[in-house]
């Protein structure tokens, strides 16, 4: 299965989740979104007080090797069990989410473009810089109707599926 992998990165509050939701809505059932946050490393060995003080905005906080492995499996047509991060306990939960391959896969996170392994598996890389988000969405919504936007995406990236 050919999978279009889109990486969307930017600081907290930059608008990356807004862009991710916008793209996911346009692709409909053909898209799966994976959040890099779900790949924070397990911290069962630390107390809650220690976990609260943890710096979560650095590469060492993430199990990026597992995310890279999962991307390879999805690109190979295999399903994965994605970890689920629980913000209330500042740790991974015991739950996992079964994710099946879809024609479009969006990876959303603050540092998804930082890791070379991940970048090399992405077909499209979108670094989000906050000050450009609102003007871009205003122009897109004024200038490009959704049908034309989908057509442009298909032309630029190849038709999913």
Model-derived features: positions:
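ATP-dependent NMP and nucleoside kinases share a basic, alpha-helical "lid"
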Residues: 92-161
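Conserved nucleotide-sensing/catalytic segment adjacent to the nucleotide-binding pocket
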Residues: 28, 32-35, 41-89
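Phosphate-binding P-loop
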Residues: 1-3
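Short hydrophobic/aromatic beta-strand immediately N-terminal to the Walker A/P-loop
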Residues: 5-7
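Short, structured coil segments at secondary-structure junctions
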Residues: 27-29, 121-122
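Hydrophobic positions on the alpha1 helix immediately C-terminal to the Walker A/P-loop
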Residues: 19, 23
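Conserved lysine of the Walker
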Residues: 16
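P-loop (Walker A) phosphate-binding loop of NTP-binding proteins
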Residues: 11
